[in-house]
Amino acid sequence: EGGKGPFTVATAHLSFVPGYNVRQLRALRRWLHGLPRPLVLLGDFNLPGRIPARVTSFVELVHEPTYPVMRPRVQLDHVLADGLTASEQATAEAAVHLLPVSDHAAVSVDLDL
């Protein structure tokens, strides 16, 4: 629960198999449908760029490459949101952190919820 009330956070690590990861994301979207908003969905989706936002119809809060960690060229890690106000979207502060703990960069988003 945040200062403005309850919100939902979900995380996922989707398959690297093309097509199967999209099916997983669609199933996840259906599962999340009835949960309270605002909702934040984040994780390693193994899907590049804007595909996760298009599949879910959620808002992408991070627009930076995350893979591979030492020279990120493609965004595979995402933070998506549904049910945020325009003000909450506008004030979201996203960052990508190049940490030597994974082959992917870490992603953080500061939200005022």
Q: At which residue positions do the language-model features occur?
A:
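Active-site regions of metal-assisted phosphoester/phosphodiester hydrolases
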Residues: 1-113
